[in-house]
UniProtKB/Swiss-Prot annotation:
The keyword Repressor applies. One of its GO terms (biological process) is negative regulation of DNA-templated transcription. Residues 36-59 bind DNA. This is HTH-type transcriptional regulator TtgV. Residues 89-253 form the IclR-ED domain. It comes from Pseudomonas putida (strain DOT-T1E). Pfam families: HTH_IclR, IclR_C. Keywords: DNA-binding, Plasmid, Repressor, Transcription, Transcription regulation. SMART domains: HTH_ICLR. Induction: The ttgVW operon is induced by toluene and styrene, but not by the antibiotics carbenicillin, chloramphenicol, nalidixic acid, tetracycline or gentamicin. InterPro entries: GAF-like_dom_sf, HTH_MetabolicPath_Reg, Tscrpt_reg_IclR_C, Tscrpt_reg_IclR_N, WH-like_DNA-bd_sf, WH_DNA-bd_sf. Residues 14-76 form the HTH iclR-type domain.
């Protein structure tokens, strides 16, 4: 093989990786799955090309078939890779999650940003009769959750606009529009705490703060029934900020200046 052939081979390999990444991003934006035709339309590739890439991703469990109904969604290997990459942060933060959950008697979670969504890395579920229960690994729109808002607020403006995309999801009657969200993110940068009041799910409220660690940015969030939120909001915000301080002291911050 001469130098020209080698360069062509490298370029082809890079193109395949880029196409696979675009397909996975499309599936990540549609957690319930997409048909081959829908994927091809979204990424602007021939259906036959999408089929070949999907087959390769499926062999690595990065994509999985939905069953007899057809279509594909992101596979379990992606979550496993994320969890493996986050092993250090999980073990370091776990004791603080437990402590915060016990102090407030509410569900607590640790999350990271994945595109326009948050990925729940770990959680402690409250033992109360009326509580909010959610699984590890769940992906939810960042713009409609407190955990997502603190992570979005940490992004530079150009990156933020790209992360928000052209159209924000409308999940409830309380979901914020772009203008209101951008204004709220500016306030979050000042206060250090974000909230969502029935914006993701009716009856569910959350509060969150940003963890600025040498391992990257994460969000620490309290998720609770809305019926308890108004009376406890000040207490929750104070507890979150204290927990943030404790965690960043123990782990080490990535920057000296808050984003």
């Amino acid at each position: 093989m001469n130098q020209s052939d080698e360069n062509i081979g490298k370029a082809g390999g890079i193109q395949v990786i880029a196409r696979a990444a675009s397909i996975m991003r499309a599936l990540g934006s549609h957690p319930h799955g997409l048909s081959l035709a829908a994927i091809a339309q979204l990424v602007g590739l021939p259906r036959s090309t999408v089929q070949r890439i999907i087959n390769a991703l499926e062999e690595e469990f990065l994509v999985e078939a939905l069953g007899p109904a057809g279509g594909f969604r992101l596979g379990p290997a992606l979550g496993q890779l994320i969890n493996q990459a986050q092993t250090d942060i999980l073990s370091l933060v776990k004791p603080y999650l437990r402590s915060l959950a016990e102090e407030l008697d509410e569900s607590v979670c640790l999350a990271s940003l994945a595109g326009d969504k948050i990925y729940v890395l770990d959680r402690i579920v409250s033992e109360r009769e009326l509580r909010v229960v959610f699984p590890i690994g769940i992906n939810v729109p960042a713009a409609a959750t407190a955990a997502g808002k603190v992570l979005l607020a940490a992004l530079p403006d150009e990156t933020l606009q790209a992360a928000l995309g052209e159209q924000l999801p409308v999940l409830t009657s309380n979901t914020l529009g772009r203008k209101a969200l951008v204004k709220q993110l500016s306030e979050v940068r000042q206060s250090g705490v974000a909230s969502d009041l029935d914006e993701h799910i009716d009856g569910v409220c959350s509060f969150a703060t940003l963890l600025d660690t040498y391992l990257g940015y994460y969000s620490l969030a309290i998720v609770m029934p809305s019926s308890r939120a108004s009376k406890q909001s000040d207490l929750i915000k104070k507890a979150l900020l204290q927990s943030k301080l404790n965690i960043e002291r123990a782990i080490g911050r990535a920057s000296k200046k808050a984003p």
